[in-house]
Structure formats: structure tokens, C-alpha cells
């Protein structure tokens, strides 16, 4: 649009005096029109004067300086592949080096597995790339440095010196338990306790295993606990004592269980949902309190949640609470359980729904919503209404039966109304006296 307007405003004088107009400052669009009018007679004038041609020339010149040709050669110095990279970028890691000299420093320092030959030509730069064959020779063959030479180290395991000489054996602090159990008491003869289960000879496998653990020799007999009835009897202990491993494990397990039992008795545990104190039997049982559901606490939380609703009246909150508690107790989870739950809910709360009409209408609206969502069908709604109608009919018949009097009760009332004959005579005498007084 600007070019057309300027072209329309231009006059023949401007076409003639283009050289003079170039010397005067003018707008770029007008200057471009002057160039265009002048290029009609000289077509080569416009490409030489436009700025984009000048910029293209600069760009071409910069490309020529930044263009690098990589010639990849094999071991026999045979050309295998040629690649052209611009902006002096590395062909291996694509790093911009900025200049050919920077590219030379980068290739020699970062890619030392290749051998590079750099050549500068008038039009472009060339880099001949070949593989260093010496880089694949292992360092073990030509390593003159002593730091890289392998060496061997041989060390003997150190023996731990014992206090008091080499031949001293380790001593164990053995505690003998009192012979309270009947099985141990039966094995005592002449005040010497012969523990057949615990202390065995070295011929048994358990004894030999323990002897190997405690560095026992065949010359040292096992320790035997002597218990005598005399008060002056002494307990003789040898250098080693054989204690069965199974017995010690059982004793340690029993002690740990007793200790944990005492710790559980000292602490007070509470239920996770009800926050009520737990008895020791409940703590030691396998049942987890996390899985339990307290109905009272759940009802209380449900009522608190419903009380926060503002746009719901009291009757609707009562119905919602009844339905929520029923669904929770009966574990109604899937959509297929809704039909059964509606019928059972109608039977369970038929008296409440019959006595309170507001709850009854809330129940009907709830059934309609379930039907809209496709959770119940018309047969389920019919069954629920039939249950409530039967409840209403039974209540009406009971009321009618209570209002009708029994025949025996009416006869008793009539008998009570009949007067005695003496009472009738007294009434007649009173009437006659009244009449005589009136005549006088």
C-alpha cells in the first residue's frame, strides 16, 4: 500500500532528478520507490543497492569462514566419509567452538582417541580425521612408571594373644538353676544331679559341636553340677562347662517374652476408633483394632456431618441418618445390593415410616432418585410400597379391634344400672310426700 501511494505521488521530475533526491534525507519507502524507478532502465542496479543483498553477502562470507569440512579416513589413509559442519561446531559432541582455532584446541583436548590434521584453504577449512592405533595398546606393555606396575601382597592372619599364656582356655560363667522341676529331681542319686538331657559325653554330636566351639580337648571332662544335702558340700567346677545350645536359646526366648509381657502390662493401650482403654487380653489377642468399626462412634460422626448441612430440614437429616447407618451396618457396597437394601430397609423401618408422614415422603423421593440413576427398577419400588401398605392395613385393623367392646362388658354395665326393689319403694314414698305437700 505504501509503495503504491508513493509511486502515485512521484512525478517525472523526481524520476529525472533521482541523483539529487538521494542526497536529501527521505523516508525509506520513498527511497525504495526511487530505487525501483531507476531499476526499470538498469535492472542490475536494484540487487546491488538493497540491504538484504548486502546482508546475504555478509552471511555468505561468515559461512565461508565458519564452514569446516571433515574427511574421515581409515587405517590405510583411505577416505571413507566427508562431512560439512557450519559455525565451527564439533562433529562428535556438537559443541560450538566459535572459530577454527577454538575447534582445533577442542578436538585435541577432548577427543584424544583420534588424530587430526588441520588445513586452511581459501574457501573453507579442512580437518582430516583418523584413528590412533597406539590408543588400543594396553598400558601393561609400555608403562614405564612404577606407580602402574602390579605388586603382590601376602599377609598371614594374626593370632590373638591371650592373657596369662598361650595354653589358657576361655572360662565361662555358668549359672546352675535350682532343681525345681520333677523331671530333674527324679534324676538325682546320692546328691549328684545327672542331667541326662543337658550334660552328655563327648561321643554325642551336640557335645562334639560344643567342644569345637569352646576349644575343648578330649583330656578335659565336662562340668558336672554336684548338689548334696549336706550344708558343707562344695560345688566343684572344672575349667569348661558344656551348656546345650537349645536350652540356652529357649531360656533367652522365654526371658524376652516375659520382659515384653511386663512392658505390655505397664503401658496403657487404646482403641484406634473408640479411643477407649484396652484390656490386656485384647492387647495380646491376634485381632487388630484398626479393623473394628464402632457403631456408636460412627453414628455420632454421621450426625455431626449432617448437622453441618444448611439447606436440609430436620426430617431429611433424620432420614439420611437412618439410611447411612443401615447401609454401614449391612455393608451395602455394590450397586447390585441397592434393590435388596431398599426392601429390607422398608421392612426394618416400616413403623417409623408409617407413623411419620414426612419420613415416608422422603423415602419415596429417595426411591425416585435411585430409579432415575438406574439403581432400582419398578418392581423394587412396588415391593417397598406393598410392604408399607401391609403395615398400614395391619395397624388399621388393630385399631378397629381395640375400639369394639366385648358383649359381656355391656351386660355387666346393664346389671349395674338396675335398682334394688327396696330402693324403688323408698323412691315412691318420697314422691307421694312431695305431691301431698304441693296440694296443701
UniProtKB/Swiss-Prot annotation:
The main place the protein resides is nucleus
* Tissue specificity note: Weakly expressed. Expressed both during, and in the absence of vernalization.
Composition-biased stretches, type Basic and acidic residues, lie in: 420-440
Q: Name one GO biological process term.
A: vernalization response
* Cellular component per GO, a single term: chromatin silencing complex
Q: Which family does it belong to?
A: Belongs to the VEFS (VRN2-EMF2-FIS2-SU(Z)12) family.
Q: How does it assemble?
A: Probable component of a PcG complex. In plants, PcG complexes are probably composed of a member of the EZ family (CLF or MEA), FIE, and a member of the VEFS family (FIS2, VRN2 or EMF2). Component of the plant homeodomain / polycomb repressive complex 2 (PHD-PRC2) large complex during prolonged cold, composed of core PRC2 components (VRN2, EZA1, FIE and MSI1), and three related PHD finger proteins (VIL1, VIL2 and VIN3) that mediates histone H3 trimethylation on 'Lys-27' (H3K27me3). Binds to ALP1.
Q: What is this protein called?
A: Polycomb group protein VERNALIZATION 2
Amino acid at each position: 500500500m505504501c509503495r503504491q501511494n508513493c509511486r502515485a505521488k512521484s512525478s517525472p521530475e523526481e524520476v529525472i532528478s533521482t541523483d539529487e533526491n538521494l542526497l536529501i534525507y527521505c523516508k525509506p519507502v520513498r527511497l525504495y520507490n526511487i530505487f525501483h524507478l531507476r531499476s526499470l532502465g538498469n535492472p542490475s542496479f536494484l540487487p546491488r543497492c538493497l540491504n538484504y543483498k548486502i546482508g546475504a553477502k555478509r552471511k555468505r562470507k561468515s559461512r565461508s569462514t565458519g564452514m569446516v569440512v571433515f574427511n574421515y579416513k581409515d587405517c590405510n589413509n583411505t577416505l571413507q566419509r566427508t562431512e560439512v559442519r557450519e559455525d565451527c561446531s564439533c562433529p562428535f559432541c556438537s559443541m560450538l567452538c566459535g572459530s577454527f582455532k577454538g575447534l582445533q584446541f577442542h578436538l585435541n583436548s577432548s577427543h584424544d582417541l583420534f588424530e587430526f590434521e588441520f588445513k586452511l584453504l581459501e574457501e573453507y577449512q579442512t580437518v582430516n580425521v583418523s584413528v590412533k592405533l597406539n590408543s588400543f595398546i594396553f598400558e601393561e606393555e609400555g608403562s614405564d612408571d612404577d606407580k602402574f606396575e602390579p605388586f603382590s601382597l601376602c599377609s598371614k592372619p594374626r593370632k590373638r594373644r591371650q592373657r596369662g599364656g598361650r595354653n589358657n582356655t576361655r572360662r565361662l560363667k555358668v549359672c546352675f538353676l535350682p532343681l525345681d522341676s520333677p523331671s530333674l529331681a527324679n534324676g538325682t542319686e546320692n546328691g549328684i544331679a545327672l542331667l541326662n538331657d543337658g550334660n552328655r559325653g563327648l561321643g554325642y554330636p551336640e557335645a562334639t559341636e560344643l567342644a569345637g566351639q569352646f576349644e575343648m580337648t578330649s583330656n578335659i571332662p565336662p562340668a558336672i553340677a554336684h548338689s548334696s544335702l549336706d550344708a558343707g558340700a562344695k560345688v566343684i567346677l572344672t575349667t569348661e562347662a558344656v551348656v546345650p545350645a537349645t536350652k540356652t536359646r529357649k531360656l533367652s526366648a522365654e526371658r524376652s517374652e516375659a520382659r515384653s509381657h511386663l512392658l505390655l502390662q505397664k503401658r496403657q493401650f487404646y482403641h484406634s476408633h473408640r479411643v477407649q482403654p484396652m484390656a490386656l487380653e485384647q492387647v495380646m489377642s491376634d485381632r487388630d483394632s484398626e479393623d473394628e468399626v464402632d457403631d456408636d462412634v460412627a453414628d455420632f460422626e454421621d450426625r455431626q456431618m449432617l448437622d453441618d448441612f444448611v439447606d436440609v430440614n430436620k426430617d431429611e437429616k433424620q432420614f439420611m441418618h437412618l439410611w447411612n447407618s443401615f447401609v454401614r451396618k449391612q455393608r451395602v457396597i455394590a450397586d447390585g445390593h441397592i434393590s435388596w437394601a431398599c426392601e429390607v430397609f422398608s421392612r426394618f423401618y416400616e413403623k417409623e415410616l408409617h407413623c411419620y408422614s414426612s419420613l415416608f415422603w422422603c423415602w419415596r423421593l429417595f426411591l425416585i432418585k435411585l430409579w432415575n440413576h438406574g439403581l432400582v427398577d419398578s418392581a423394587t419400588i412396588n415391593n417397598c410400597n406393598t410392604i408399607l401398605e401391609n403395615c398400614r392395613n395391619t395397624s388399621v385393623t388393630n385399631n378397629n379391634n381395640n375400639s369394639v367392646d366385648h358383649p359381656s362388658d355391656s351386660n355387666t354395665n346393664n346389671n349395674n344400672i338396675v335398682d334394688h326393689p327396696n330402693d324403688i319403694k323408698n323412691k315412691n314414698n318420697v314422691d307421694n310426700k312431695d305431691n301431698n305437700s304441693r296440694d296443701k
